[in-house]
UniProtKB/Swiss-Prot annotation:
Pfam families: Glyco_hydro_66. Keywords: Glycosidase, Hydrolase, Signal. Residues 607-669, 683-788 are annotated as: Disordered. It comes from Streptococcus salivarius. It comes from the Bacteria. This is Dextranase. Residues 1-38 form the signal peptide. The gene is dex. GO terms for molecular function: dextranase activity. Residues 619-636, 706-761 have a biased composition (Low complexity). The lineage of its organism: Bacteria, Bacillati, Bacillota, Bacilli, Lactobacillales. The keyword Hydrolase applies. Residues 693-705, 771-788 have a biased composition (Polar residues).
Length: 822
C-alpha cells in the first residue's frame, strides 16, 4: 500500500512524495513525512494538491484533491467572505454563538477564503466601537435592535488572522446613523440636487419606511474626511481589523450646503466624483498599513476610481444597474462578465462581485408571511437554495476573471454555511443543503488551484474565434456575449504562453442570473456529452499548431472531474482561409468546463521533484479525457434622477510529437482523478499589511489551522526532512469505514482536514483525522496539531496473511477517513 502526494500547477507536475506501507488485517499504521518542499512553490501561484492511497498493484483505494494558493498579497487573488449577525439571535453577534461562528470560519478557511468583511458589526457609523463598552445595541436598527458583543468580534478577528486571512471592518464612507443629531455641522452634509434621497435642497437621507436611518456627508468635505479617518483608525486599531470595507448607498447628484437651493447643475456634483479623492485621503490620514476599498454600487465609475489607491475593487451588482453592454440592464450572466472585463481593463484588478442570489420576497406584515416572488414561496415552503443557480454565478464570475463573494458565517442554526441571498446579510431565508456546500467547496478548490489561468497577470479576452457543437454537429454556442440562454456559452481567454476556453452550460435554461423565482425558474441545465470545441489558431504555423494540439487539457470543478486536469483528444483542421483550427473533443459538461491549451511550443517542461530517490516521474498530463468518472470518485472521501439605476434597491431591514515518448498521465502518476484534500498550516502571528507573507490557506474540510511565512523565505529555503516542529502523519487502519458503501463524495460533519505547513525549511502535507472535542480545541504553538488520517479496510477484504501487505478486493469499500469532509 502506498500513500502518494502530488503537487501540480496547471498541467505540470511540480513535485511528488510517497510512502510505502505494510498493513496487517485489523491493524493500523502511522506514516510520516509527506512533504511539499518550499522550493517547489512560487509566490502568488495556485496549485492542485492530490493525495491518494493505492494498493500494491497501483489501484486507487481513495483520494482527495484541493487547491493551494501561495501568496504574499491577498489582493492579487481576493477570495472574499462575510461575517455577520446571526438570524437565530436577532441578527446579533454574540459570545454565546462563538462556537457556531468558529465552525463556519473553519469551513470557509477550508474553502480558501483569504479575506473577510465584518458586516454591520459596528455600533453606529460615526462611532463603530465605543471605548470601554463590552456590548452595545444598534439603536438605528429599528427592525431587530441587534446586539454586538465586542469580545465576540475580537475573537472572530483573531481566528481570521490565525487562518492567514485579513479582517475588514464594514462601514459606510459618508453616513451618520443619527440623522436628527449628526456628529458634524450641517455645512458638512451632502444636499440633494434633485428629489432623490429626500427632497431637493434637503440633506441626503436614507429612510426605511417613515424612519430616517442615515444622513450623508459629502465625501469630498475635508472636515468629514479628517473626522471619519480618526474614527476608523481608532476602531481598527482597538479591534484588530486590517482594513475598511467602505460602502455607499449608491450614486446621487448633490450640492454643498451653500448651493443647496441652486438649480444650476454647475453647482452640483455626483457623489462618485469624490470617491477617489476620499480613498486617497483615507490612505494619507489612516496610513498605508490599512487596506481600503469602496463599494461602487452597480459599477460604472471605473474612470473616476482609476487613480484611487484602493487595494481591491468591489462592486455590488443589481439587475436595476445599467450593463456595460449598451442598451441593457445587468440581468444576464454575460452582463456580469462584461462588468468584470471593464474593471480588469481599467484597473488591472480582479473584481470582487457582490451579486445576491434569489432574494426571497416575503411580506411579513401578513401573518405567517406572504411570498412576493417564487424564491419567497420556496423559503416559506422550507426549500433550500437552488444549488445550480448559485454555482452558475460562481462559474460565470470566476471564468470571467472575478470572484463572487457569496459565502457567509452567520451562526445560523438552520444552515452549516450560508450563501448570500439578500443585501442585508443576516437575513437569509433559504437554507443551504449539505450537497450544495460540498459543490461550493469543490468550486472554491478549482478557483484557487487554477487562479493563474483564470485571473493571473496578463490574462485577457482572446480574439480567436471559438465555438461549441454537439455530436450531431449543431452549434450550441449561439451568443458570445452570454446574454441568451439555451446554449453552451463559450468564450476564450489568453495568457502568457496559453489560452483557455470557458464553457458555461445554459442548455435548457435562461440566461438570467438573479433567479428571484427560485425553483419555478429551473437553473439546472441539460447535461451535455461528446461536445466538440473549435478554436482558431490563426497566425500559427502548421508545426506550431501540431505542437499545440498535443498540449490540450480539460478540467472542471463539477463532480465528473473535481478539478482533475485531463489530456483532451485534439486534432487539426483548416478554415476557409487555410488557417489552422484546433478541434477538441470534450466528453462531458455539467455546469462549467475549462479547456487549457498550452501555446508555448518552445518551453522545456518543468522537471518534477520527488522527495524519494528513484521515484522521479515525468510531469506532463497525457491521458485522454474520459467521459467515465474516475475510480476515486466511486470511493467515499470521508443615482438621483440622473442615475436612478446606480442606487441600491430597497432591501429588507472554470497528435503526439513523434519524437517524444508518451509520458505518464497525472492519473497514472497518482492513479486517480481525486476529490479534494484539505490544506492547512500552523499558526503564526498576523502582522497586517507589513507582513508580506505567504498565505497557504487550507483547502479541505471543516477544521484546520493556518500559517503565514514570508514569501522570500519560503521560496528560497531548501527542501529537507520533516523537523520536530512540523510533522505529518497518516494512519492506516484495517478497521471498516463507516461510510464504506458510499459511491460518491459525501459530506462528513465530523471530519477534519489534511494540512500543509510551511516552515522555514519546508512545507508538510498533513492529513488529519477526526479529532475529539478536546483535541480539536487544543492550542497550537509553532506547529499544527499532530493528528492522523485513517485509511480503513474491512478485515474480510484483506489477505489472511498478517505479514503481507493488504490486498484490497473491493476498492469502493476503502476510504481516507481522516480527510473526508465534502
Amino acid at each position: 500500500m502506498t500513500v502518494n502526494l502530488t503537487l501540480q500547477h496547471a498541467s505540470e507536475i511540480i513535485g511528488q512524495d510517497n510512502v510505502d506501507l505494510t498493513l496487517a488485517a485489523g491493524a493500523s499504521a502511522k506514516v510520516s513525512n509527506l512533504t511539499v518542499a518550499s522550493e517547489w512553490l512560487t509566490n502568488n501561484t495556485g496549485y492542485l494538491v492530490t493525495i491518494s492511497v493505492n494498493d500494491k498493484s497501483g489501484n486507487v483505494l481513495s483520494s482527495k484533491r484541493a487547491g493551494l494558493s501561495v501568496e504574499d498579497d491577498w489582493t492579487v487573488f481576493p477570495r472574499y467572505g462575510i461575517v455577520a449577525g446571526s438570524p437565530t439571535d436577532q441578527n446579533s453577534i454574540l459570545v454565546k454563538n462563538l462556537e457556531a461562528y468558529r465552525k463556519e470560519l473553519e469551513l470557509m478557511k477550508s474553502m480558501n477564503i483569504n479575506s473577510y468583511f465584518f458586516y454591520d458589526a459596528y455600533n453606529e457609523a460615526t462611532d463603530p466601537f465605543p471605548e470601554g463598552v463590552d456590548s452595545f445595541v444598534q439603536k438605528w436598527n429599528t427592525w431587530s435592535h441587534t446586539q454586538v458583543d465586542t469580545k465576540a468580534v475580537k475573537e472572530l478577528v483573531d481566528q481570521v488572522h490565525k487562518s492567514g486571512a485579513v479582517a475588514m471592518l464594514y462601514n459606510m464612507i459618508s453616513a451618520d446613523s443619527n440623522p436628527k443629531n449628526p456628529a458634524l455641522p450641517l455645512a458638512a452634509l451632502a444636499y440633494n440636487f434633485y428629489d432623490s434621497f429626500g427632497k431637493k435642497g434637503e440633506p441626503m437621507t436614507y429612510t426605511i419606511g417613515d424612519n430616517p436611518t442615515q444622513v450623508y456627508y459629502d465625501p469630498a468635505n475635508p472636515d468629514w474626511q479628517k473626522y471619519i479617518a480618526g474614527v476608523m483608525k481608532s476602531a481598527m486599531d482597538r479591534m484588530g481589523f486590517d482594513g475598511w470595507q467602505g460602502d455607499t448607498i449608491g450614486d446621487n447628484r448633490v450640492t454643498d450646503y451653500e448651493h443647496r437651493n441652486s438649480t444650476d447643475e454647475a453647482d452640483s456634483h455626483m457623489m462618485s466624483d469624490s470617491y477617489a479623492s476620499f480613498i486617497n485621503a483615507m490612505k494619507d490620514l489612516i496610513g498605508e498599513k490599512y487596506y481600503i476599498t469602496i463599494n461602487d454600487v452597480n459599477g460604472g465609475n471605473d474612470d473616476k476610481l482609476a487613480k484611487a489607491r484602493q487595494d481591491v475593487v468591489y462592486n455590488e451588482l443589481w439587475t436595476n444597474g445599467g450593463s456595460v453592454i449598451p442598451g441593457r440592464m445587468q440581468v444576464a450572466y454575460g452582463d456580469l462578465k462584461a462588468r468584470i472585463d471593464m474593471v480588469r481593463n481599467k484597473t488591472g484588478k480582479s473584481l470582487i462581485v457582490g451579486a445576491y442570489m434569489e432574494e426571497p420576497g416575503i411580506d411579513y406584515t401578513v401573518p405567517g408571511g406572504k411570498a412576493t416572488n417564487g424564491a419567497g414561496k420556496d423559503a416559506l415552503a422550507g426549500k433550500p437554495l437552488q444549488a445550480d443557480a448559485t454555482l452558475l454565478v460562481d462559474a460565470t464570475v470566476a471564468a470571467a476573471g472575478g470572484y463572487h463573494m457569496s459565502i457567509a458565517a452567520l451562526a445560523n442554526a438552520n444552515a452549516a454555511l450560508n450563501v448570500l441571498q439578500s443585501a442585508y446579510y443576516p437575513t437569509q431565508y433559504l437554507s443551504v443543503a449539505k450537497d450544495t456546500i460540498r459543490k461550493l467547496y469543490n468550486y472554491q478548490q478549482f478557483i484557487t488551484a487554477y487562479e493563474n489561468l483564470l485571473r493571473g497577470e496578463g490574462v485577457t479576452n482572446s480574439t480567436q474565434a471559438v465555438s461549441t457543437k454537439n455530436a450531431s454537429g449543431e452549434i450550441l454556442s449561439k451568443d458570445a456575449l452570454g446574454v441568451t440562454g439555451d446554449q453552451v456559452w463559450t468564450f476564450a481567454k489568453s495568457g502568457k504562453g496559453f489560452s483557455t476556453v470557458q464553457m458555461i452550460n445554459m442548455m435548457g435554461i435562461n440566461a438570467g442570473w438573479h433567479n428571484e423565482e427560485g425553483y419555478a425558474d429551473n437553473k439546472t441545465p441539460d447535461a451535455q456529452e461528446n461536445l466538440t470545441v473549435r478554436l482558431s489558431l490563426a497566425g500559427k504555423t502548421a508545426q506550431e499548431a501540431a505542437k499545440i494540439a498535443d498540449q490540450v487539457y480539460v478540467t472542471s470543478p463539477d463532480d465528473w472531474a473535481t478539478s482533475s486536469m485531463k489530456k483532451a483528444q485534439a486534432s487539426l483542421e483548416t478554415d476557409e482561409n487555410g488557417q489552422p483550427v484546433l478541434v477538441i473533443s470534450v466528453p462531458k459538461l455539467t455546469l462549467w468546463n475549462m479547456l487549457y491549451i498550452k501555446e508555448d511550443t518552445t518551453a522545456t517542461p518543468v522537471e518534477p521533484v520527488t522527495n524519494q530517490a528513484g521515484k522521479k516521474v515525468d510531469n506532463t498530463v497525457t491521458s485522454e479525457a474520459s467521459s467515465e468518472t474516475a475510480k476515486s470518485e466511486n470511493t467515499t472521501v470521508n443615482k438621483g434622477s440622473e442615475a436612478p439605476t446606480d442606487t441600491k434597491p430597497s432591501v429588507e431591514a472554470p497528435k503526439l510529437d513523434e519524437t517524444t515518448k508518451p509520458a505518464p498521465s497525472v492519473d497514472e502518476l497518482v492513479n486517480s482523478a481525486a476529490v479534494p484534500v484539505a490544506i492547512a498550516v500552523s499558526e503564526t502571528a498576523h502582522d497586517k499589511k507589513d507582513d508580506n507573507s505567504v498565505s497557504n490557506t487550507d483547502q479541505g474540510t471543516v477544521a484546520s489551522d493556518s500559517i503565514t511565512t514570508p514569501a522570500s523565505e519560503a521560496a528560497s529555503t531548501a527542501a529537507s526532512t520533516v523537523s520536530s516542529e512540523v510533522s505529518e502523519s497518516v494512519t492506516v487502519s484495517s478497521e471498516p469505514s463507516e461510510t464504506e458503501n458510499s459511491s460518491e463524495a459525501s459530506t462528513s460533519e465530523s471530519a477534519t482536514p489534511t494540512t500543509t505547513a510551511i516552515s522555514e525549511s519546508h512545507a508538510v502535507v498533513e492529513p488529519v483525522a477526526s479529532l475529539t472535542e478536546s483535541e480539536s480545541q487544543a492550542s497550537t504553538s509553532l506547529v499544527s496539531e499532530t493528528t492522523s488520517t485513517i485509511v480503513s479496510v474491512a478485515p474480510s477484504e484483506v489477505s489472511e496473511s498478517t505479514s503481507e501487505e493488504v490486498i484490497l478486493m473491493d476498492y469502493q469499500k476503502t476510504s481516507i477517513v481522516g480527510i473526508d469532509s465534502l
